[in-house]
């Protein structure tokens, strides 16, 4: 190691004073607080890596605050690419396929999503609350009219004038877990999806969904 012993010693003393390490019979070891700090560091490092990985798409959003850092801590990132353009979109299909309840916000409508929702609602009575932009609802009512289930139990649809190119979804799974996810849209469809089951991510997305729902108007298809 090229670091001077005096530098190492000074660093250890500072960690001791902070209560992060203690001297034992076999040398220095992390305290309980030290273990927590290390865990937080690795979570932070993972979040930074995830943010940098999707920076190309985050930069397309009109507001940098639309997605908070907690969505990346412990999150799973899936990106579309030239060899698998539907890869990110398939993540959302998979989410809906194992859900017992879905709450979401979407600026767009995709055939794969519509078909999956229709199947789950008809077959399993999937509880669904969705907020669509006005343009997305028009697309749903015209291009995908054959998939629309009128007066379906447990399904509530809302309309809001405009939405950013960001889809949000809060999914309750059959195993009792709740998962938060977001997808970034471009003219070529969904480019990246991030999924996260952490309490902070779920709490943020629940609050965002409720905020959009309060601004929207419930409609009958």
Give names to the regions the model predicted:
Residues 172-221:
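Amphipathic alpha-helical interface segments
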Residues 111, 162-165, 189:
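Short acidic/glycine-enriched loop/turn segments that link adjacent beta-strands
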Residues 52-130:
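PLD-like (HKD) phosphodiesterase/transphosphatidyltransferase domain
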Residues 34-61:
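Conserved segment of winged-helix/HTH DNA-binding domains
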Residues 106, 132-134, 184:
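Short beta-strand/turn micro-motifs composed of small residues
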Residues 31, 110, 133:
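Residue-level signal for threonine
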Residues 1-44:
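Basic, Lys/Arg-rich alpha-helical nucleic-acid-recognition elements, primarily the DNA-binding modules
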Residues 134-174:
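HKD-type phospholipase D/PLD-like phosphodiesterase module
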